[in-house]
Amino acid sequence: GYKARPHPRFPSHACLSVNDCVVHGTHDMTTAPLKEGDVFSIDIGVLHEGWIGDAAWTYAICGTDPQNLALMNAGKDCLAAGIKAMQPGRPLLDWARAVEDVAEKKAGFKLIRGLGGHGYGRTLHGPPFISNVIPKHSGEWSDAFTPFKTGMLVAVEPMLTVGTSSVRSEGRNWPLFSSDGSMSVHYEADVLITPEGPLNLTEGLFDLPDVVGT
């Protein structure tokens, strides 16, 4: 599994996060069968000819709970809006402004603070860090005014919950849960910045169904 300090090596081949698990769900926490009404995300990395892809998508099991579907739609909508804002020469902050406007101001949900996207390519994680929220103070996000540059490869990944912007963990274990136990979703796309604007290398994810297991 993937190794990132200070965490132990990730014990699974994919992150499987169910309901209030925002990210980094592991195989040993998802042993119970998924049931109607559950929401779960799959986050995987792929290595091909020395290059890495990193993407995540969220699904609902069988049921069509209105709040769950609204949360999922907000996740997809803010991802799409954020990608459109990733124009060469513009600051990374433009991404966060677009995402926050859709997810929080318009949809009324909460974005997780302190987690976000990242550069990638030959390695899974690299600079810059890409926050999903506008920083509250100058020291919260040092890369906020770093510009998007032609040739940049970035993985952007809004994480939303129904009720909180914070997460909790159990010791040094990988899974991160919404601190209030509320439902969460996670979407991640790989984007190449071109002279003409952002190119979503994972555009096909938007064609996936929201509800599975019916």
For each feature predicted by the language model, list its residue ranges.
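Active-site neighborhoods and metal-handling regions in enzymes and metal-associated proteins
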Residues: 1-214
